[in-house]
Amino acid sequence: MIVSRSATDEAIARPSTVTIGVFDGLHLGHQSIMRAVVDRAALNGTTPTVVTFDPHPRSILYPESAPPLLQTFEQRLEGMMFLGIRQVLAIPFTLDIAALSAEEFVERFLVDSLDAKAIYLGRGFAFGRKRSGNIDVLRRMSVRFGFEADEVGEVELRGRRISSTATRQALQLGRVNLARRMLGRPYGVEGLVTEGRRLGGPVLGFPTANIEPRSRVVPDRGVYVTATLVDGVWYRSVTNIGIRPTVGDDDRQVGLHAGTEEAGRRRGEHLAVDELVERAEGDPGELADV
């Protein structure tokens, strides 16, 4: 997959079929947009392309209220590639970019840089200065520049629009099953194995590992039945997020029992944990029985 951070990058493939957005989480709504782009690109012989922003625009415009992210930038790229996207133009978001009118943005990035033949927006998406760009602006500009412009409808779950905000809220409330349905996959916490208090064997009676989460949104405090990836093998595991009431420690942490001693030996290495099912908190003995 081609990943460019400059509109003048000579590696950019043209012509293209394009969508625009941050796409944090790559939930089912985002996936619907990606499928539309990939399908259209296959028909018109162009490169399926995503124009995105890094960092998140709100972290520049409204840093005090910027949302925690569901994915790292690298995780978003991996997901896009899996969905069939073959090119990403990741625009470094700055106040200068925010000051561009919708028309300037389209002409500079979508027309001049990517030679877009078709542009898809998610319903309600806006771009450009004061969020002035929308599907109506694109359709008006399409007459001049000769591209198609279309809007992809929302995806709903139980009558509620699926969005990155709704997914974050579900996770922050510990509703990992709801988040899984909105994402179309389990939500994973990925991070470095860190030094713990070495209580796994002598006190708890089973091997444990502590990780420092790499993902920005960590589910609410609780005990979750999970799966942990160690050396390319998934192990059933139990993960505790939050305080450690069983050992009298109030620090927020992510600790897991992965059914293999290898997890705890990987200090300084990455582990991936997929959140599957929430269950009630219990004492160490109860966790050992899962």
Regions found by a protein language model. Name each.
Residues H27, M80, I119, A179, ...:
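Residue-level signal for inorganic ion chemistry
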Residues D96-F206, L229-D231:
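Classical nucleotidyltransferase
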Residues P68-R76, L100-V106:
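Glycine-rich, highly charged phosphate/nucleotide-binding loops
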Residues Q75-Q87:
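A glycine-rich helix N-cap at a beta->alpha junction
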Residues G196-D274, R279, V290:
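Phosphate/ribose-recognition catalytic cores of enzymes acting on nucleotide-derived substrates
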Residues D9-T72:
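N-terminal catalytic cores of NTP/NDP-binding nucleotidyl/phosphoryl-transfer enzymes
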